[in-house]
A protein has these predicted regions:
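Class I SAM-dependent methyltransferase Rossmann-like catalytic core
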Residues: 41-77
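Conserved class I S-adenosyl-L-methionine
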Residues: 81-90
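Conserved SAM-binding loop
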Residues: 120-121
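Active-site capping/gating segments
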Residues: 190-222
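Conserved SAM-binding loop of SAM-dependent methyltransferases across substrates and taxa
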Residues: 91-103
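Conserved beta-strand signature within the Rossmann-like core of class I S-adenosyl-L-methionine
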Residues: 178-185
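Conserved SAM/SAH-binding beta-strand->alpha-helix loop
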Residues: 113
Length: 222
């Protein structure tokens, strides 16, 4: 009952947010297109809240990642033409930022929840969207295709220990030949599970213009 009440309250806040920020988010958009754009954005946020209410540990956050967080993650992508794999894409906030930096054929998006997969396929019909589990990442990677980066929005700290270890192991294996792992977390202090698993942190940055504020880190698995 408590989770349900939180979800309803969040839904009301999202509606208020859409109205209060309408002038800013719709600036430059043709008036005839504004209702559809608002409906699309609110629909994606509502889908996110609904999934959080049903499975809070697997979603990890009440709201989708903000645009500033998504852009910071995309800015950490390494140069080159290798495959970029996104884990836990949700409703596509980070996917959109990655798409602005990476050709569609280089981007592989993995999402476990069916509702989010439907949203992703609707928003990004040109991308490869796979419904799958990050603990089996190796099963979805094309053969003989080097992975330049794994970009993860998975809530590593809230995953059960064995699942967390399996996911981290899959990310390390996928990037073992020179790739990097880009991970964000709402835990602004403390060591990442990736560091505990032996990864070396190369970069990090705080994104204060996100709700809640987040930390983005880039790791190498060797």
């Amino acid at each position: 009952m408590k989770i349900f009440s939180c979800a309803l309250a969040a839904r009301e806040r999202l509606a208020a947010l859409a109205l209060n920020l309408g002038r800013q988010t719709l600036e430059g958009v043709a008036p005839s297109l504004r209702p559809a754009l608002l409906l699309d954005r609110f629909g994606r946020a509502e889908a996110f809240v609904g999934q959080w209410a049903r499975a809070p540990r697997s979603v990890g956050a009440l709201c989708p990642s903000g645009v500033h967080l998504a852009r910071r993650m995309a800015a950490m992508l390494p140069p080159g033409d290798g495959l970029v794999v996104e884990l836990g894409a949700g409703t596509g906030a980070v996917t959109r930022a990655l798409q602005a930096c990476v050709a569609p054929e280089r981007l592989l998006v993995l999402e476990r929840l069916p509702a989010f997969c439907r949203v992703l396929r609707s928003r990004f019909p040109e991308l490869t969207i796979i419904r799958g589990d990050a603990t089996r990442l190796a099963d979805y990677l094309p053969p003989n295709r080097p992975v330049a980066a794994v970009v993860s929005s998975l809530p590593l700290l809230s995953l059960p220990g064995p699942v967390q270890q399996a996911v981290v192991g899959q990310m390390r294996a996928a990037t073992a030949h020179g790739g990097c792992i880009i991970q964000f977390t709402y835990a602004l202090w403390g060591r990442s599970p990736l560091v505990r698993a032996g990864c070396r942190r190369e970069k990090r940055g705080l994104v204060l213009r996100n709700l809640p504020p987040a930390k983005v880190e880039c790791f190498r698995s060797f």
